């Protein structure tokens, strides 16, 4: 499987924990009306909370205390496989890096002596260029396009080994860009300070992110339906969780809607969480077992 070589990685003096933005070429969705903002999916119930709370996790310990774990559970009235890599950011230096050309995730991870990897934000499938705001070493490498503005309401910064998730729009991008040398925009924002963010922020975000120039035709048809998903979260004790939910496997894992994903992030105990590029891009990797999940485009 090939990916675009724009990526992020985390590393310590001895070992690198790699967070990459390799992009798998996927289908482009057609448009739906902007007014259709209620995420489709199965209503969350107490049974869903219990299923997540009592999930049987298969775990594998990585270097410097990082843990890779996965589970197959029945939640939201559907089968789901959830894979997680959790680590302490105090034991790793975090960086955002943009690579020059296409390569396989595993190859790039090995080249950087990575401990683990996950895909990042959105990109242009024709050119490989980022389509969300990205600033590296104080230099802006990409701006959020109008087509991505509707879902780009969050960002992750990695300065001074402190991982933070922020709210993001056309106004905050300037402030964040001045404050942080390394920052990447993505979205939708799933959690902020323990509060689920998707429902209240989406209707307003499209106009904010593009200074009122976005249109309903920019929203991909099916965005709110169940798909493979990837996201990154921070727990109250500042542990980092990189998560992938497999999708498009009817009997194995159908994937989640954005609404279901924010519910999952909350149930996993996260304080802040940010959705990343999903679909065929959703990949979680570590240097002990290789690709942990089952990517499907």
Task: Explain the meaning of each model-derived region.
Residues 44-167:
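Zymogen propeptides
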Residues 1-49:
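Bacterial Sec-dependent N-terminal signal peptides
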Residues 128-222:
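Active-site-adjacent helix-turn-beta-strand microarchitecture at beta-sheet edges
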Residues 92, 161-164, 196, 240, ...:
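Hydrophobic residues embedded in beta-strands of well-ordered beta-sheets
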Residues 83-86, 154-157, 189, 230-234, ...:
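Short beta-strand scaffold segments in enzyme catalytic cores
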Residues 98-103, 168-175, 245-250:
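Short, solvent-exposed aromatic-acidic interface loops
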Residues 127-150, 215-271, 281-297:
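Conserved, well-ordered active-site substructure
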């Amino acid at each position: 499987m090939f990916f675009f070589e724009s990526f992020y990685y985390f590393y310590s003096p001895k070992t690198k924990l790699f967070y990459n933005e390799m992009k798998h070429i996927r289908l482009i969705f057609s448009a739906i009306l902007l007014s259709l903002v209620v995420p489709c999916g199965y209503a969350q119930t107490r049974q869903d909370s219990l299923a997540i709370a009592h999930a049987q996790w298969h775990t594998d310990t990585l270097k410097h205390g990082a843990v890779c774990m996965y589970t197959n559970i029945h939640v939201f009235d559907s089968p789901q496989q959830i894979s997680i890599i959790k680590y302490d950011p105090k034991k790793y230096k975090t960086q955002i890096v943009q690579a020059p050309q296409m390569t396989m995730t595993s190859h790039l991870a090995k080249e950087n002596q990575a401990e683990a990897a996950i895909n990042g934000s959105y990109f242009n499938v024709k050119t490989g260029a980022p389509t969300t705001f990205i600033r590296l070493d104080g230099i802006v490498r990409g701006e959020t396009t109008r087509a991505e503005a509707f879902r780009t309401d969050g960002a992750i910064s990695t300065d001074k080994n402190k991982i933070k998730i922020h709210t993001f729009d056309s106004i905050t991008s300037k402030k964040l860009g001045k404050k942080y040398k390394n920052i990447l925009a993505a979205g939708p924002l799933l959690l902020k300070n323990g509060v689920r963010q998707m429902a209240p922020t989406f209707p307003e975000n499209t106009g904010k992110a593009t200074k009122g120039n976005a249109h309903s035709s920019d929203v991909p048809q099916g965005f709110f339906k169940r798909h493979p998903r990837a996201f990154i979260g921070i727990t109250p004790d500042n542990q980092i969780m990189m998560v992938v939910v497999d999708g498009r496997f009817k009997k194995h894992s159908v994937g989640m809607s954005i609404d279901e994903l924010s519910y999952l992030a909350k149930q996993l105990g996260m304080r802040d969480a940010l959705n990343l590029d999903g679909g065929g891009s959703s990949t979680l990797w570590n240097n002990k077992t290789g690709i942990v999940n089952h990517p499907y485009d």
